[in-house]
């Protein structure tokens, strides 16, 4: 526990200092971090290249390597994201409500930092910076534990941030990286109840399940996206095709990409050939289909029950033909990861029923699921997309990283 004890003690101390830091000071520091990331671009890209080369040596898929890779454009986007967070309103100190009670006590409920956030995540180095910027803006210290495949990139990014904070006389331990990527140390972080106020895992199903099983600290579950699109009998089929192509092929390695397709039986014979032709013009996609869909599609593999429950993160999609809207809703609620789901329909009642009855953080009508994102939702950068109902749900922006505290002022009142 020596590693985690040291990180935890540092983070706890830093969190008390951060909680007292004013909005202007936080924003100034964030803007300087954004500048430093661009100034240190050669160093960061050199370290990232080491991770990419090692990943390629180990035969990691091109899609997963893409998640890992940084270039000048992506680093500019990361720095821009930090500036965007600096421009957002500061939720800390906001009054949720205030009133005077029956005995004259003035009671104010305000937003305050959570304290120490721990984050365990995979592959994407940008998460290090996004998570730091959101935690810092909300007065929280953060302990980051990335994957082995991104250790050089994460180390470089965190080093740049820490040096920048120190140059401003701020506690560099506002952000710390767990450099030991072993499962044993990760398990210690999951059990650090004396230091960690909340743990946020961000990655694939295996990581999420491991954290849920082994964590002793509070957890906000994020990330896994077994996302469906249902093409209703009253859908505009051209619109539906365009949406499915986008949701599946634009960036298949992300959690808001479509993984399952449900099609009403009345439009399946018209829609599936249209979709197959359109999608293959963009990128070949493997269809894993039920018996009825296999008879319509030119190239489809039989789907297993496991396929219907899988987040592929690849150019693969499961396909099922359903008899009714109700069957589609039941199917989705059986297999969903509670992330994002979409219906394509011109029937207003069907759309409303779908949105009311489907159990997911984001439920769309006539739009791609690729929009489930903190920036798109106007929240700024996100620390993750919560697929649970407590303490936050959906894209987690600044407000999700706060708690509340009651401030009570009296004039000598006692309870009788």
From Swiss-Prot:
GO biological process: L-proline biosynthetic process
Entry's localization field: Cytoplasm
Enzyme class: oxidoreductase
Assigned EC number: 1.2.1.41
Main location per the UniProt record: cytoplasm
Alphabetically ordered keywords of this record: Amino-acid biosynthesis, Cytoplasm, NADP, Oxidoreductase, Proline biosynthesis
Entry GO MF terms: glutamate-5-semialdehyde dehydrogenase activity; NADP binding
Gene3D superfamilies: Aldehyde Dehydrogenase, Chain A, domain 1, Aldehyde Dehydrogenase, Chain A, domain 2
Gene Ontology cellular-component annotations: cytoplasm
Pathway assigned to this chain's UniProt record: Amino-acid biosynthesis; L-proline biosynthesis; L-glutamate 5-semialdehyde from L-glutamate: step 2/2
Pfam families to which the protein is assigned, alphabetical: Aldedh
InterPro entries for this protein: Ald_DH/histidinol_DH, Ald_DH_C, Ald_DH_N, Aldehyde_DH_dom, G-glutamylP_reductase_CS, Glu-5-SA_DH, GPR_dom
Catalytic activity: L-glutamate 5-semialdehyde + phosphate + NADP(+) = L-glutamyl 5-phosphate + NADPH + H(+)
Function: Catalyzes the NADPH-dependent reduction of L-glutamate 5-phosphate into L-glutamate 5-semialdehyde and phosphate. The product spontaneously undergoes cyclization to form 1-pyrroline-5-carboxylate.
Protein family membership: Belongs to the gamma-glutamyl phosphate reductase family.
This protein's name: Gamma-glutamyl phosphate reductase
Protein source organism: Streptococcus mutans serotype c (strain ATCC 700610 / UA159)
């Amino acid at each position: 526990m020596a590693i985690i004890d040291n990180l935890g003690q540092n983070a706890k101390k830093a969190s008390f200092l951060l909680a007292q830091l004013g909005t202007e000071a936080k924003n100034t520091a964030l803007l300087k971090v954004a500048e430093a990331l661009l100034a240190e671009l050669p160093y960061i890209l050199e370290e990232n290249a080491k991770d990419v080369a090692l990943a390629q040596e180990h035969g990691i898929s091109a899609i997963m390597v893409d998640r890992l890779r940084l270039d000048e454009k992506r680093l500019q986007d990361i720095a821009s994201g930090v500036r965007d967070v600096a421009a957002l309103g500061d939720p800390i100190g906001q009054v949720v409500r205030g009133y005077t009670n029956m005995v004259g006590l003035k009671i104010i409920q305000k937003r305050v930092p959570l304290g120490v956030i721990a984050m365990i995540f995979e592959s994407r180095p940008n998460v290090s910076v996004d998570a730091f910027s959101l935690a810092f803006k909300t007065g929280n210290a953060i302990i980051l534990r990335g994957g082995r495949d991104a250790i050089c990139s994460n180390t470089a990014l965190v080093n740049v941030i820490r040096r920048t904070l120190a140059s401003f006389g701020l506690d560099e331990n506002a952000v710390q990286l767990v450099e030991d990527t072993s499962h044993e140390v990760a398990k210690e972080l999951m059990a650090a109840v004396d230091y960690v106020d909340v743990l946020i895992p961000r990655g694939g199903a295996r990581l999420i399940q491991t954290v849920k099983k082994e964590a002793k600290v509070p957890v906000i579950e994020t990330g896994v996206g077994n996302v469906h699109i249902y093409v209703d009998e009253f859908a505009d089929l051209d619109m539906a095709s365009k949406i499915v192509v986008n949701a599946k092929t634009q960036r298949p390695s992300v959690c808001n990409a479509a993984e399952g397709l449900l099609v009403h039986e009345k439009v399946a014979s018209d829609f599936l050939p249209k979709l197959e032709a359109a999608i293959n013009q963009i990128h070949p996609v493997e269809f894993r289909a039920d018996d009825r869909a296999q008879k319509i599609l030119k190239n489809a593999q039989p789907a297993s029950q496991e396929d219907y429950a899988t987040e592929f993160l690849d150019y693969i999609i499961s396909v099922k033909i359903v008899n009714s809207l109700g069957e589609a809703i039941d199917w989705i609620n059986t297999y969903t990861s509670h992330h994002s789901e979409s219906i394509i329909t011109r029937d207003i009642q069907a759309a409303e029923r779908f949105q009311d009855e489907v159990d997911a953080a984001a439920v769309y009508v006539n739009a791609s699921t690729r929009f489930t994102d903190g920036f798109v939702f106007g929240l700024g950068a996100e620390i993750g997309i919560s697929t649970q109902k407590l303490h936050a749900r959906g894209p987690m922006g600044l407000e999700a990283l706060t708690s509340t505290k009651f401030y009570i002022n009296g004039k000598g009142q006692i309870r009788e």
